[in-house]
Swiss-Prot record:
Pathway: Metabolic intermediate biosynthesis; 1-deoxy-D-xylulose 5-phosphate biosynthesis; 1-deoxy-D-xylulose 5-phosphate from D-glyceraldehyde 3-phosphate and pyruvate: step 1/1. Pfam families: DXP_synthase_N, Transket_pyr, Transketolase_C. It comes from Brucella ovis (strain ATCC 25840 / 63/290 / NCTC 10512). Binds 1 Mg(2+) ion per subunit. Binds 1 thiamine pyrophosphate per subunit. Keywords: Isoprene biosynthesis, Magnesium, Metal-binding, Thiamine biosynthesis, Thiamine pyrophosphate, Transferase. This is 1-deoxy-D-xylulose-5-phosphate synthase. GO terms for biological process: 1-deoxy-D-xylulose 5-phosphate biosynthetic process; glyceraldehyde-3-phosphate metabolic process; terpenoid biosynthetic process; thiamine biosynthetic process. The gene is dxs. Mg(2+) binds at D150, N179. The keyword Metal-binding applies. PROSITE patterns: TRANSKETOLASE_1, TRANSKETOLASE_2. It catalyses: D-glyceraldehyde 3-phosphate + pyruvate + H(+) = 1-deoxy-D-xylulose 5-phosphate + CO2.
Amino acid sequence: MSRPSTPLLDKVPTPDRLRALPERDLPQLAEELRTELIDAVSTTGGHLGAGLGVVELTVALHHVFNTPYDRIIWDVGHQAYPHKILTGRRDRIRTLRQAGGLSGFTKRAESEYDPFGAAHSSTSISAGLGMAVASELSGEKRNVIAVIGDGSMSAGMAYEAMNNAGALDARLIVILNDNDMSIAPPTGAMSAYLARLVSGRTYRSVREAAKQVAQKLPKFLQDKARKSEEYARAFFTGGTLFEELGFYYVGPIDGHNLDHLLPVLKNVRDTQKGPVLIHVVTQKGKGYAPAEAAADKYHGVNKFDVITGKQAKPPANAPSYTKIFGTSLIEEARHDDKIVAVTAAMPTGTGLDLFGEAFPKRVFDVGIAEQHAVTFAAGLASEGYKPFCAIYSTFLQRGYDQVVHDVSIQNLPVRFPIDRAGLVGADGPTHAGSFDTGFLAALPGFVVMAASDEAELRHMVRTAAEYDEGPISFRYPRGDGVGVDLPERGSVLEIGKGRIVREGTKVALLSFGTRLQECLAAAEELGAAGLSTTVVDARFAKPLDHDLIRRLAREHEVLVMVEEGAVGGFGSHVLQFLATDGLLDRGLKVRALTLPDIYQDHGKPDAMYAEAGLDRTGIVRTVFAALHRDELGHEALPTPFRA
């Protein structure tokens, strides 16, 4: 299929060429950039709506500022695709999120135009402030610009950074990309005029002179003068909050109108004092009708037909783990009115949108605020409710102190459904669920489970609902289940007890999580080679099933632990127990298979697990290496690379 015609964009491989264009050509460039973005993402999938919303802003920023000397930091990075196209990566834009291709987020190792990597929200202002201070210490005159969405402004970290920037009076530019119009809409020509006026040198010079005069007044009159000036501008702009944090506020302005953006950005660029916040209002999905009409459905997309907007979705062999969690929690909530659900701005991603439809008064979306979500859930638990605080593994890292201090130390029965456990594929290392088993199983009294299939997940939801003795978690991966039969309602599992799935005598494979299917496939291959193999679904990393592990250690020559997590998790706990119990003193051959001690780059999950040695082939190789043989009894094959 032929690509769209983009004659002007073809002449702009890098920002220096963009800066050479006359301003009259920039609207055409923006339209061609938008067309190229739509076409590229239609072939790869990825984050579409956010990028479409910042096309004009991206063009304006690279036209006004001297990148890469001047630093542009994109919060989260979902919106950075237009930036990548303009910064020397257009020839690879159709490799987005593919193995060996461009990252779906900003990445320092990928380009000098990406000064700071991102994928989690609300980090841009802190990073930008650090860069601005470093620039000042070095005697540099560079501009530092942090672009942050209004959604990311729900996280406390953004305000902590702004408060610090205001106190330091740092030379930092923050662009608030308000794409939900959640703060204030622009008011047409008057808004644009005021933004241009108050961002200019003349206004700011007069303002500084007035401040100097006011400083000679008694303090109570100084305060009144300052408040009068702030509230006079806030009457038009709504910027009082940001002024209180020490920022000079400009806006709101239309983020799709280059005639509005360019003069304001130039004025701010040419002003050398203090932190500035520019409030820009944009529309997610701008310029592509299907995305404008359904912004939520076009935030992250599969490959799609550009003409119809229809996304290609492969047929599912089984319901997704996320859906199974959501429907299972609904079933438990029908039997227990104390069950409530908490999400940190991810109701659809965690399956709690389904719960919210069934029980709208029992679900709480606290915004991008994982720390608050965890302690909010702890407060609910302290009053006898049963909160299920559903958070992706990678985002639970943001609330770990609250897990320790507010939940675990007080032994409060907060339930933690942990979605996106293990490798997540195209989103890469920033979103991989690698560490939760290790950091939760280290906590005294914390029950840590992992579902091996969708039926086990249903059992674990029921088990967590019934468990009131302290905090409990259960992890499960992204994607579809394996197609096992599902009970209408889960059963309560005995805490700390695993299950034997297949009996053998020579080799024992002890699986924690959904690698169970690969263990069963490996057992078939090992059996065909004359090695009778036991396969066990551990279910629990804490408490461990000590009796079962003792039996496996005493009755088998080889014991292999398999998990979808980093070093320091399930396998480490098993090895600690084996050593303490003296079970390593009899010559047992023990191997622990984990994710490698590197940040694996993005790719297809199956290929990534194979690279990690966590597929059938890797498990078989590990067993034969432990026995110093291969399938034919020859010299052992090399073991998988473990960084």
